[in-house]
Design a protein with these regions (language model features):
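Catalytic cores of TIM-barrel enzymes
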Residues: 1-122
């Protein structure tokens, strides 16, 4: 089971607060509406979406990860990437005020295992 330290919580909360501030800007709703129009085949300006970014080459602002647990490390890295992209190369990206968390499943091993039999009954 992953234990999140107090320092990791502080780091993630600080980054999440910054992300939420950027995501609350009205430009994101405007960009989302433009993407909907484009996907609905309406005429809008050409939209720019950048998704192939060499993150490992961009320096300490995006690559200085302060958390150590695997779950926090992934979340911090993703939030830093979103903030960096918004600050320096936003294109027509839409920041949403949500953080997607992976599903965490812990198997205790105390479950009922299926009894499998082959065609001969063994």
């Amino acid at each position: 089971m992953t234990t999140i330290s107090k320092k990791e919580k502080e780091v993630l909360r600080k980054l999440a607060t910054e992300l939420a501030e950027y995501a609350s800007l009205p430009i994101h709703q405007q960009k989302a509406d433009m993407w909907k129009c484009l996907n609905g085949l309406e005429k809008v300006k050409p939209m720019i979406w950048m998704n192939e970014i060499p993150w490992h080459e961009l320096g300490p602002e995006v690559n200085s990860i302060e958390t150590t647990s695997e779950l926090c490390h992934r979340q911090e890295k993703r939030i830093r990437q979103l903030i960096y992209q918004w600050k320096y190369m936003p294109g027509d990206m839409v920041l949403e005020p949500v953080i997607v968390c992976p599903l965490v499943i812990h198997d205790t091993g105390f479950d009922v295992l299926p009894q499998l039999k082959n065609a001969e009954g063994y």
